[in-house]
């Protein structure tokens, strides 16, 4: 795993860093020795302020930047701001994403466009402009995307979400091939259910008593439990490290053994 001595002076940018998996990734990378730029929407400013304070508390530099990852101009400006504030970009974690639980027939074209705009288009734009910055710097880098178990095995009620996450696997493989000659690796992580605010939202929609859904999901995992955000952050920490220098084009499951390749 990455260590402070190895990662000292390197810069990471994490999108969707206000809460859940993104926040856990940002804090883990800071503990690994990275200076960390945080991205989210302005509505999540309080969460970003809190995360930045936690990063600075472990002696790392940081900043936060508002941007909608589905908008190309905002992504370009975000990456330029990271370089201006922290001196470069070594690791890009494209974590921002949204979900939707709806039957296939009830999912509208507008629903589909909204989900894929953030999840798939947003990942494409972050891969593209982070990759360009890393090529300009000339010292390689790490790009890491957020796939899902639903990006490997479709699930009922998640048609738009599944489409976006299957697409991320394809983008990851193509980017790995094109960016590889520049010393840039591109991988993704694929969590199953994770105890996050998004998970809590689905529990509310389903209407099960608190804890019942988790018990049922735990039964589907070979290791008997679903993930915490920190479980995902550990995998990202490794993919961001120099020890992962020969891994690229891969989408790594982090689900306790729910989906197998």
Curated annotation (Swiss-Prot):
Pathway: Secondary metabolite biosynthesis. The keyword Oxidoreductase applies. NADP(+) binds at residues 21, 68, 95, 128, 161, 165, 194, 196. Belongs to the short-chain dehydrogenases/reductases (SDR) family. PANTHER family: 3-OXOACYL-(ACYL-CARRIER-PROTEIN) REDUCTASE (PTHR42760:SF121), SHORT-CHAIN DEHYDROGENASES/REDUCTASES FAMILY MEMBER (PTHR42760). GO terms for biological process: fatty acid biosynthetic process. Armillaria species are both devastating forest pathogens and some of the largest and oldest terrestrial organisms on Earth. They forage for hosts and achieve immense colony sizes via rhizomorphs, root-like multicellular structures of clonal dispersal. One genetic Armillaria gallica individual localized in Michigan's Upper Peninsula stands out as exceptionally large, covering hundreds of tree root systems over approximately 75 hectares of the forest floor. Based on observed growth rates of the fungus, the minimum age of this large individual can be estimated as 2500 years. Keywords: NADP, Oxidoreductase. It is an enzyme of class 1 (oxidoreductase). It comes from the Eukaryota. This is Short-chain dehydrogenase/reductase ARMGADRAFT_1018421. GO terms for molecular function: oxidoreductase activity, acting on the CH-OH group of donors, NAD or NADP as acceptor; quinone binding. Short-chain dehydrogenase/reductase, part of the gene cluster that mediates the biosynthesis of melleolides, a range of antifungal and phytotoxic polyketide derivatives composed of an orsellinic acid (OA) moiety esterified to various sesquiterpene alcohols. The first step in melleolides biosynthesis is performed by the delta(6)-protoilludene synthase PRO1 which catalyzes the cyclization of farnesyl diphosphate to protoilludene. Melleolide sesquiterpene aryl esters are cytotoxic secondary products with anti-cancer potential. Armillaridin shows therapeutic and radiosensitizing effects on human esophageal cancer cells. Armillaridin induces autophagy-associated cell death in human chronic myelogenous leukemia as well as of hepatocellular carcinoma cells. Armillaridin can also inhibit the differentiation and activation of human macrophages and thus might have potential to be developed as a biological response modifier for inflammatory diseases. The active site is at residues 161, 165. Signal peptide: none annotated. Gene3D superfamilies: NAD(P)-binding Rossmann-like Domain. Its EC number is 1.1.1.-. It comes from Armillaria gallica (Bulbous honey fungus).
